[in-house]
Amino acid sequence: MGSKRIIPSRHRSLSTYEVMFTALFAILMVLCAGLIAVSWLTIKGSEKDAALGKSHEARGTMKITSGVTYNPNLQDKLSVDFKVLAFDIQQMIGEIFQSSNLKNEYKNSRVLQFENGSVIVIFDLLFAQWVSDENIKEELIQGIEANKSSQLVAFHIDVNSIDITESLENYSTTSPSTTSDKLTTSSPPATPGNVSIECLPGSRPCADALKCIAVDLFCDGELNCPDGSDEDSKICATACDGKFLLTESSGSFDAAQYPKLSEASVVCQWIIRVNQGLSIELNFSYFNTYSMDVLNIYEGVGSSKILRASLWLMNPGTIRIFSNQVTVTFLIESDENDYIGFNATYTAFNSTELNNDEKINCNFEDGFCFWIQDLNDDNEWERIQGTTFPPFTGPNFDHTFGNASGFYISTPTGPGGRQERVGLLSLPLEPTLEPVCLSFWYYMYGENVYKLSINISNDQNIEKIIFQKEGNYGENWNYGQVTLNETVEFKVAFNAFKNQFLSDIALDDISLTYGICNVSLYPEPTLVPTSPPELPTDCGGPFELWEPNTTFTSMNFPNNYPNQAFCVWNLNAQKGKNIQLHFEEFDLENIADVVEIRDGEEDDSLLLAVYTGPGPVEDVFSTTNRMTVLFITNDALTKGGFKANFTTGYHLGIPEPCKEDNFQCENGECVLLVNLCDGFSHCKDGSDEAHCVRFLNGTANNSGLVQFRIQSIWHTACAENWTTQTSDDVCQLLGLGTGNSSMPFFSSGGGPFVKLNTAPNGSLILTASEQCFEDSLILLQCNHKSCGKKQVAQEVSPKIVGGNDSREGAWPWVVALYYNGQLLCGASLVSRDWLVSAAHCVYGRNLEPSKWKAILGLHMTSNLTSPQIVTRLIDEIVINPHYNRRRKDSDIAMMHLEFKVNYTDYIQPICLPEENQVFPPGRICSIAGWGKVIYQGSPADILQEADVPLLSNEKCQQQMPEYNITENMMCAGYEEGGIDSCQGDSGGPLMCLENNRWLLAGVTSFGYQCALPNRPGVYARVPKFTEWIQSFLH
């Protein structure tokens, strides 16, 4: 039976599930189409919004003036320094805008770069829609001024430096146009398609116009522009020969013809760069320049380059620089046409291939050979041909040829103004397997020649002296030699120590030979006896002098006294008598050498006078039957000295006492007692009206019971009829501010008393009384006069970790003291006409006060014409009578201004502390001054400020064991060092903030160098001298 296959039909109805799936698929297709359409519309809308300016990116710049210091790492966007600071800036910007009226529009920010000039920040801002530049700038400034970011505690932004412009992303740049040696910035209108960055003064734009860098960074051998345009040879090609970067192993550059001066001066600069590890040798085929036109040769490039030679007039011979990079600059300031300039060639060489004798041997005919000037000394050796000036010191010819054609080296010629070390260093020398002989010729001629020393040192900082000569050896070249046997790498150093005036030292023909030094064929030189034998500096004594043995002199009088002398004479009189000291002749080196006269025995005596310089000087009178005279000289010049005598008697120099019914004025004259404190000056010096009211039994210098002096008797004020106006009037008489409070005080006895009433003209009427109504006295408290308040708003800043530039007006009581035109010390303004400073500043400089000048309101010593500045001469100097220069105790002095000053925002007095007020250890106080910023460095231009913690005297004594830290001193500083006052800060304030007023806690006195660990600064403790200071103010 056959079978039959059944084929299903092609058309059938869909199942329920199939219908559902089909419907869902169709819906999904519609949704996708819709989403695509919405996305397309959104994109087109965004493009339209962008076209209409609804999405916005702006670029901004601002300057951070404190809280962060610029360093080269901020140029590297991958550095930790860049990332940390950029994060903080972006956080600050975000916090400000998120709390501003633009919080809905603001999206984010991005720091692009940092530039030098404090720290300049360039950043981008992104907003969801278009915002005007003015609106962005206004919100940013308001946020900074309102401290809307926690980051503003860490650093300060100069709001005047903030600038906002359209982002440069959609704009083209205009490159700076150039001339031969000068860049100028073009500034087309800021319209879409064309914008150029505007640079701050002293900066120029890079070629991409995206970045500004300092003018000095152009053509300095280091890339500072991202596009490298700051070192572009087209820009940097010199006006002298059209060259700039020299990179071959040898080459040349020249200023064969001076370029015509288009400005006040022209600078031609070349960069020489050879392979790493090589050094560079320079030679001059000719060299004939004007004295004003200087060729400087530096080791290295960029900001780290080191000046190795300054050349003018004469061919310097060969110069070798031990670096693979050299910067050469030729500064042309003359318009002379008679000078042909110079032609220089350079060659690379490998100094490591030199042997020891090649490194040492030198007759200076061809420059300094391979010797190097010591950069850590005080001056430089000079290469000399022929005679030096002045006469009577230094050679007339070299040693090599024995005539004026040869060369030698000498310490700086001329009179000189100080003692200085002049050093010459060899390259590192290889250890020797056998001894070698170092030989040389030296010339030490002149009345004041000091010392020539030769040292060797190794990399372990072990140094030893192998040769030394001192004194004047006459007009001869002298031979010197020393055997060396060093087993490790070492250097040789020639050190000449030069005094003032006739003290030149010269060298020639240095050589190194193998084997020990032979016995010298030349006789050992002997010193020239050009001066008498040195006098002993110890006078003997102290000498006890009594009548009739009353005449005494400085040592060796009438001939010059010795240097470094210290002499003491004790003058004696019978009990009840006093002493008059008279100088018949007097001539000392000014300031440096002094006669100090004290009232009584030295240990606890009071200072009577300090005399120095040429005479005549005034007689001095003791108040006791003993007087101490000290004579102290330094190690420089000497003079003829002095001859003195003394007499004894009763009341010598003291005015005759007044009658019982008279008052004796401070100038000695007498006035009737009834005229005392009557409101009218009867004494010519006004002393009869000087001390007529005081506080009694007060807990502070501005409160207590009130007493008035009627004739010679003090009367306590009654509370009867006392008014608020009375309080104000009495407080004013006391030299204080307005009355703060007054209250009755019950007391029985203690008379006599005085009742106060106010006259119709407002003056006080005093009526003596034996009793007060209800035994009620007045207890008065006065406000202090306005003091210790900063008038110029100061930004909040973090704790200073080192001396920092202060803001103008930050310390309006800090005064700069100039002596003979030189900034010498600091001081503090305590009233309209009195300054507090250090006694050691004025010691020996007190006889002619008008040589001192006080500059108030000063911020920068380089700008003495600022409108905030007021200058006053000093007309009186008072050293605290307890000051002891040798013990450095009571180091405080008062200086009176010739004319009173008016208080301004930049000139204000500082407050005085209460007498014996305690400033506890650990308290953070402030110091300020223009002194040296590092030990043996240069003084500061801008007023420096720093915070320092106070130390106990016990701890200070442990850290300063060589000094006696007395109760009149206080100390401040960090154990780790790094913050301290230094030379030039003396006399300036140590200031502590209390109740929103700055108090003068200390006066900068002394220290051991500056800012060393466990070496605090020492200050005169002002609370110990408050009463003494106030005696000048009222």
Swiss-Prot record:
Q: Which residues form the SEA domain?
A: 54-169
Q: List the disulfide bonds.
A: 199-212, 206-225, 219-236, 240-268, 539-567, 658-670, 665-683, 677-692, 772-782, 787-911, 825-841, 925-992, 956-971, 982-1010
Chain ranges of the LDL-receptor class A domain: 197-238, 656-694
Q: Which reaction does it catalyse?
A: Activation of trypsinogen by selective cleavage of 6-Lys-|-Ile-7 bond
Active site positions, chain numbering: 840, 891, 986
Domain named CUB: which ranges? Answer: 240-349, 539-649
Provide this UniProt record's keywords sorted from A to Z.
Disulfide bond, Glycoprotein, Hydrolase, Membrane, Protease, Repeat, Serine protease, Signal-anchor, Transmembrane, Transmembrane helix, Zymogen
Functionally, this protein is described as follows: Responsible for initiating activation of pancreatic proteolytic proenzymes (trypsin, chymotrypsin and carboxypeptidase A). It catalyzes the conversion of trypsinogen to trypsin which in turn activates other proenzymes including chymotrypsinogen, procarboxypeptidases, and proelastases.
User: What family name appears in the similarity comment?
Assistant: Belongs to the peptidase S1 family.
Q: What is this protein called?
A: Enteropeptidase
Question: What organism is recorded for this protein?
Answer: Sus scrofa
